[in-house]
Amino acid sequence: MSGAKRRTAAPAPEAAAPARTHQVILGVDPSLRGTGFGVIRVAKPHPVTLAQGTIVCPASWERSRCLAKIYAALRDVIREHQPTVCIVEGLFFAQNLQTALIMGEARGAALVAMAEAGLEIYEVAPRKVKQAIVGYGAAQKLAVAKMVQRMLQLAELPDPDAADALALALTHVQSTSRFSLAAAKRV
């Protein structure tokens, strides 16, 4: 996965347990220039971060090259961590049609990698994620990143795109609890 900034967390002591006993969730925040991803394993007392990072594509790259890189990098993450569920950020209203089309293409590259692996795919609107993680649907990116750091007990503040992806995964964990704040829609 050359070119992607990636951090893999050291396995926690409970990592020796069989993978099937703890659900592994992949969150993806798609963008042409910086697609964030975060992989967590549901565990007690809190979820464990397995990997996080940002798939970076320079502005000088053609769109097709970026889309291929997003697909290939996410395919590699899926193969390495074997998630059972993927959560992708839902589409948001964009005033610029060109921006909306480009975002849709990046999202499509991510969805193909997930679908090819036969994974369950859900989407959650950005406001629902912020509401679930911070308690306020219009929260700033920094507030989301700080809460993700706290919830996952990360030593460092995650990059903004990776933080959003981890927030998506955490929102899915919350959505499967009895008192869900953010309902996910299956894609």
How would you name each of these model-derived features?
Residues M1-V187:
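Phosphate- and other anionic-substrate recognition elements at nucleic-acid/protein interfaces
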